[in-house]
A protein has these predicted regions:
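Sec-dependent bacterial lipoprotein signal peptides
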Residues: 1-22
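Short, surface-exposed loop and linker segments with low hydrophobicity and enrichment for Pro/Ser/Thr
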Residues: 5, 31-39, 91-98
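Residues embedded in well-ordered secondary-structure elements
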Residues: 9, 33, 112-114
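A structural "domain/chain start" motif
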Residues: 18-84
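Surface-exposed short loop/turn segments
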Residues: 26-28, 61-71, 75-148, 152-155
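C-terminal alpha-helix
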Residues: 156-163
Length: 163
């Protein structure tokens, strides 16, 4: 009986403190009955690399360390678009502008979840020739670091777009 109480006294608080949080469902907004499948090429506006770290630990010798992760959102977006058959271009050529999308990325919010927070990103696809929006998608992610949050949010937003 004492053993059961001991196990429950450890298990219940740990479940309460580390419970799963549900992420908001990704949101997709289409404009003028357009589809990104009508396009062949994409140009991603450059983004800066983001580095974040978590977890500091020590041992009996006083050695400390942590985990550092980095992400460049435009690389993650490009990889997903490559998997879906799109071709990345380094510049927009007037002859191909009608078949080219401009892809913009932005962090659009944070939400407190349990003992941490999640990050929401918004990805905008624009017609390169008319400068009109094709589709805008948003997704939310939560991971160990801010880099993980952004990576998961991008994946969730674009995963829904390509279903």
């Amino acid at each position: 009986m004492k053993r059961l109480l001991f196990i429950l006294s450890i298990l219940i608080p740990s479940v309460l403190l580390t419970g799963c949080a549900s992420m908001k469902a990704p949101v997709i907004t289409y404009f003028e009955n357009q589809s990104i499948r009508d396009y062949t090429y994409f140009y991603v506006t450059p983004t800066n690399e983001l580095s974040s770290s978590t977890g500091v630990y020590g041992n009996q010798y006083g050695v400390y360390g942590g985990t550092t992760k980095s992400i460049n959102p435009s690389d993650v977006i490009s990889g997903i678009l490559f998997k879906n058959g799109f071709i990345r271009v380094n510049e927009i050529i007037p002859e191909n502008a009608s078949k080219t999308m401009i892809v913009n990325f932005g962090e659009s919010g944070r939400r407190n979840v349990n003992l941490g927070y999640s990050i929401e990103v918004t990805i905008q696809f624009i017609n390169a020739s008319s400068q009109k929006p094709i589709v805008i998608c948003s997704g939310e992610g939560q991971g160990e670091t801010e880099a993980d949050d952004i990576r998961k949010a991008i994946n969730r937003a674009l995963e829904t777009l390509f279903r």
